[in-house]
Design a protein with these regions (language model features):
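Active-site beta-alpha turn of Rossmann-fold NAD(P)-dependent dehydrogenases/reductases
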Residues: 2, 42-46, 97-99
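Conserved cofactor-binding/catalytic machinery of classical short-chain dehydrogenase/reductase
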Residues: 22-25, 72, 80-81, 127-130
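NAD(P)H-binding glycine-rich loop region in Rossmannoid oxidoreductase-like domains
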Residues: 1-18
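Conserved Rossmann-fold NAD(P)-dependent oxidoreductase catalytic core, especially the SDR/UDP-sugar
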Residues: 24-71
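Catalytic helix-loop patch of NAD(P)-dependent Rossmann-fold dehydrogenases
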Residues: 17, 54-95
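Conserved internal alpha-helix in NAD(P)-dependent oxidoreductase domains
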Residues: 13, 17-24, 39, 80
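Alpha-helical substrate-binding/gating segment
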Residues: 121-157
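NAD(P)-dependent short-chain dehydrogenase/reductase
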Residues: 86-136
Length: 158
């Protein structure tokens, strides 16, 4: 679940309540449930956590600092939630920072704030189908035992 732009920018308290609060609730539920085998948490972050892609660095890089764009409350709430995951003490967690997701429904969005992009900037997007395929493959690799142990406890941009 995520509360995204443009709504997150108009209702920043709600963005924090949904994006941070729901992540906190999931982590609490994991601890309260107490399974025999440690659960795996796949958190979906966002490249928006690292802010604008202004020249001379147009593309996201490994190790880019967390630096949400000014007034991007979606990014702020997701960065706070990701930190919660990292500091949760869970043995198996991963944060996947998604690019913008483009799907057919985006054609109906008329609010320019949705894009948070400057005119001389690049666009880092993937399709909704490619995003779903990556999650499907992650589950399949875990299920068939080919997902390496080193995958967990890290952050990836996808």
């Amino acid at each position: 679940m995520a509360f995204v732009s443009p709504a997150a920018d108009y209702y920043p308290k709600q963005a924090m309540k949904v994006n941070y609060g729901s992540t906190r609730n999931i982590i609490n539920a994991i601890y309260e449930f107490g399974q025999q085998e440690p659960p795996r948490l796949v958190y979906i972050g966002t490249v928006a956590e690292t802010g604008d892609r202004m020249p001379p660095v147009h593309w996201g890089r490994v190790g880019d600092p967390i630096k949400p764009s000014m007034f991007d409350y979606y990014a702020v709430s997701k960065a706070a939630a990701e930190r919660l995951v990292i500091e949760s003490g869970l043995k198996y967690w991963v944060s996947l920072r998604q690019m913008g997701i483009i799907g057919r429904a985006m054609a109906e969005i008329e609010d320019a704030i949705m894009f948070h992009n400057c005119f001389d900037n690049v666009l880092e997007y993937c399709s909704d189908r490619d995003s779903a395929r990556s999650m499907k493959n992650l589950c399949a690799f875990f299920h068939d035992g080919t997902l390496e142990e080193s995958f967990w406890g890290d952050i990836f941009t996808i």
